[in-house]
């Protein structure tokens, strides 16, 4: 019985747990199979069980039908999760999130091609970066030669340097040509020196030829030469000068050349004369020096002279009293008359410094007392008040010239000076570089088609383009010029071969060219005076010493002889200038020689040195451009003739001059511009200024 009633609490607990379901759910209890009719019978009382451990209520002893139907029990413990239900309907779209962007997806398939339509031209792009230098292009045609640029203004002449001390030094190495010096005054003509002995014949040197030697003994006359070939005709007349060419366009600027190596340092110049400097201003007084060491006591001086007798009677000297206390400084009394010079007393101990008294009025100078013994050096006093600046003393005597001081540091920039006078208008400057590209403006109206502009400058070489297609087979080119000889091979020297058979005699060759002229021989002895010919005129000398002249021949026409000097032995030259605007104040160096017999003209210096004494004719022809020109023909640093030409703007003018001069051996003749204010001598590679000279007759 007791065992059958044990599950009753469990049934009550189950009923209480299902009560809320029935009241709230409706058909939940019926579905579980718990009918209320089963528990209508009276419930028997059993033993009191233990309180509920899991719930919050306690067992009630009352019949089941007495329970109210609307009573709700305590919520039971949460049950186990049930099975997953079916998915619900989709909810409303939520608010856009702010998450991180997802991984970039794969590219989608290509869309259909768009419609073709002509788009508007976009604005010009900004200039790209400068690309690397491209390969050198094909050689272009030579451009038209431009006009010569304007001549720059001449620089101001420098100050003359001080004359150096003349000391006979050792001859130095050949230095670079120095700057042209100032034109000196012509010196007096020296007396002719004594005639020297004939020296031995030396090798052909580079220096100036020496004086001619004494005439040697007359040699035997040589056999007469073969007659020369007949001439080809008389020389034609000079052609008409061509018309001046049009002004060419200025060529593009050339590529700047590489920087040359620095030249060798020139020899050190002689020391200059000592300069006379202006004595400097008095320096600032230096600080007070330290106290010197105590000197040795000097010798006791002799006693002074006995002074005159005083007016009062001298009293007896009393005993020396004790030193009293230092009293207050008294008022400055009137200056008394100078007393008698007493004997120098013994040096007493150094007293304490009293307070400074009021400055008294300057007294009359007293008599000079005997020199006392040297006292000890006292302590340094306080620095005195700086005195009033004294009047400026008289100028001192000029001091000895001092040595040049070291170069000082550059001074600070001074204040800007006053505005100077307005300068002359300068030359037209070069066109400036391209400016910064401005902002893109609004599109303007369509303008009228302009005229074709001038050809612009060559652009920067672009990048190398892609290789083009292979072209058709080209025509065979012309035969090229023979190349330069290659370097010698490295093969071994072969053994000498056997001698071949003697070939047939060759065809006689054509006569060779005339060889270079040989060195001139020594001058021969003077010939005997020739016979006077009444029918001849003044002509050339014959080898036998006579004068052939121009004998009246057939038809009364003169017949000239061959003469004494041949073309290769006659001193003559012609030199041209290939660069414009040479320096003034020095010989003009006509740097290219067309003919230079006897090598008398030196193109490196522009000076002709006379190799054979005689009468010479000199001529010069110059072009003028940029400014006026003033040219002179110099003989031994003395001007012989002057030529001046006034320049007209826009024209290329010419000037010429000449003179007949008698020269002795080693005399020098050259062309020079005396002033740098008229130095417009112009010459180029194709417009030559020239200088010529030749021997008319020897003396």
From Swiss-Prot:
Domain C1q stretches: 566-699
The reply on keyword Repeat is yes
Residue ranges of the region described as Triple-helical region (COL1): 73-532
Q: Where is this region: Disordered?
A: 66-542
The reply to whether Isomerase figures as a keyword in the UniProt entry is no
Q: What residue spans carry the Basic and acidic residues bias annotation?
A: 334-344
Task: Give its localization.
Answer: Secreted, Extracellular space, Extracellular matrix, Basement membrane
Where is the stretch described as Nonhelical region (NC1)? 533-699
| SUPFAM superfamilies cross-referenced by the UniProt entry | TNF-like (SSF49842)
Recorded phenotype for the gene knockout or disruption: COL8A1(-)/COL8A2(-) mice exhibit decreased proliferation of mesangial cells, reduced phosphorylation of ERK1/2 and increased p27(KIP1) expression. Diabetic COL8A1(-)/COL8A2(-) mice reveal reduced mesangial expansion and cellularity and extracellular matrix expansion.
Q: Name one Pfam family in it.
A: C1q
What is the reported tissue distribution?
In the kidney, expressed in mesangial cells, glomerular endothelial cells, and tubular epithelial cells.
UniProt PTM comment: Proteolytically cleaved by neutrophil elastase, in vitro.
Oligomer status and interactors = Homotrimers, or heterotrimers in association with alpha 2(VIII) type collagens. Four homotrimers can form a tetrahedron stabilized by central interacting C-terminal NC1 trimers.
Q: What PANTHER family does the record point to?
A: COLLAGEN ALPHA, COLLAGEN ALPHA-2(VIII) CHAIN
Q: What does this protein do?
A: Macromolecular component of the subendothelium. Major component of the Descemet's membrane (basement membrane) of corneal endothelial cells. Also a component of the endothelia of blood vessels. Necessary for migration and proliferation of vascular smooth muscle cells and thus, has a potential role in the maintenance of vessel wall integrity and structure, in particular in atherogenesis.
What is the name of the protein in this document? Collagen alpha-2(VIII) chain
Organism listed in the record: Mus musculus
Which classification does the entry list for the species? Eukaryota, Metazoa, Chordata, Craniata, Vertebrata
């Amino acid at each position: 019985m007791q065992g059958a009633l044990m599950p009753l609490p469990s049934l009550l607990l189950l009923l209480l747990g299902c009560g809320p379901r029935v009241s709230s759910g409706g058909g939940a209890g019926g579905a579980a199979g718990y009918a209320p009719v089963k528990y209508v019978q009276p419930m028997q009382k059993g033993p009191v069980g233990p309180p509920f451990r899991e719930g919050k209520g306690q067992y009630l002893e009352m019949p089941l039908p007495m329970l109210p139907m609307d009573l709700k029990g305590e919520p039971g413990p949460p049950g186990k999760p049930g099975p997953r239900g079916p998915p619900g309907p989709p909810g409303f779209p939520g608010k856009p999130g702010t998450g991180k962007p997802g991984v970039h997806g794969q590219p989608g398939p290509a869309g259909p091609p768009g419609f073709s339509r002509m788009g508007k031209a976009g604005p010009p792009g900004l200039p790209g970066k400068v690309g690397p230098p491209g390969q050198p292009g094909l050689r272009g045609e030579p451009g038209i030669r431009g006009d010569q640029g304007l001549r720059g203004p001449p620089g101001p002449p420098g100050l003359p340097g001080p004359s150096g001390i003349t000391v006979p030094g050792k001859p130095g190495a050949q230095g670079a040509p120095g700057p042209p010096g100032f034109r000196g005054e012509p010196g007096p003509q020296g007396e002719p020196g004594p005639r020297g002995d004939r020296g031995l014949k030396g090798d052909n040197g580079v220096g100036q030829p020496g004086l001619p030697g004494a005439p040697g003994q007359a040699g035997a006359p040589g056999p007469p030469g073969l007659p020369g070939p007949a001439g080809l005709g008389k020389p034609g007349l000079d052609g008409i000068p061509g018309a001046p060419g049009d002004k060419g366009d200025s060529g593009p600027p050339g590529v700047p050349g590489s920087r040359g190596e620095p030249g060798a340092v020139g020899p050190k110049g002689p020391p200059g004369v000592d300069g006379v400097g202006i004595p400097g201003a008095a320096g600032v007084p230096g600080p007070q020096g330290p106290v010197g060491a105590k000197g040795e006591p000097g010798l006791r001086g002799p006693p002074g002279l006995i002074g005159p007798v005083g007016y009062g009677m001298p009293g007896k000297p009393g005993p020396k009293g004790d030193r009293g206390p230092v009293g207050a400084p008294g008022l400055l009394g009137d200056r008394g008359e100078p007393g008698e010079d007493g004997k120098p007393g013994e040096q007493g101990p150094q007293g304490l410094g009293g307070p400074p008294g009021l400055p008294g009025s300057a007294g009359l100078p007293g008599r000079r007392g005997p020199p006392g013994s040297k006292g000890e050096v006292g302590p340094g006093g306080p620095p005195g008040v700086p005195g009033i600046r004294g009047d400026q003393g008289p100028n001192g005597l000029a001091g000895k010239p001092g040595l040049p001081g070291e170069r000082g540091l550059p001074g600070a920039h001074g204040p800007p000076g006053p505005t100077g006078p307005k300068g002359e208008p300068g030359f037209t400057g070069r066109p400036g570089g391209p400016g910064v590209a401005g902002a893109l403006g609004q599109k303007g109206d369509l303008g009228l088609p302009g005229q074709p502009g001038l050809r612009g400058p060559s652009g920067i070489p672009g990048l190398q383009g892609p290789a083009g297609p292979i072209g058709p087979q080209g025509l065979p080119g012309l035969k090229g010029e023979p190349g330069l000889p290659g370097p010698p091979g490295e093969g071994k020297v072969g053994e000498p071969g056997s001698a071949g058979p003697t070939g047939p005699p060759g065809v006689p060759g054509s006569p060779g060219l005339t060889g270079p002229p040989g060195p001139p021989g020594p001058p021969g002895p003077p010939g005997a005076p020739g016979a006077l010919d009444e029918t001849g005129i003044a002509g050339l000398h014959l080898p036998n010493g006579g004068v052939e002249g121009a004998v009246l021949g057939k038809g009364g026409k003169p017949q000239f002889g061959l003469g004494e000097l041949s073309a290769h032995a006659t001193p003559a030259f012609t030199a041209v200038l290939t660069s414009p605007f040479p320096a003034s104040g020095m010989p003009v160096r006509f740097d290219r020689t067309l003919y230079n017999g006897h090598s008398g003209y030196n193109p490196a210096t522009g000076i002709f040195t006379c190799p054979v004494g005689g009468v010479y004719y000199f001529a010069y022809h110059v072009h003028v451009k940029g400014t006026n020109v003033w040219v002179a023909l110099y003989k031994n640093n003395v001007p012989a003739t002057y030529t001046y030409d006034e320049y007209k703007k826009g024209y290329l003018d010419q000037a010429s001059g000449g003179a007949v001069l008698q020269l002795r051996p080693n005399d020098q003749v050259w062309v020079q511009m005396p002033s740098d204010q008229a130095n417009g001598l112009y010459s180029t590679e194709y417009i030559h200024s020239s200088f010529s000279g030749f021997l008319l007759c020897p003396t």
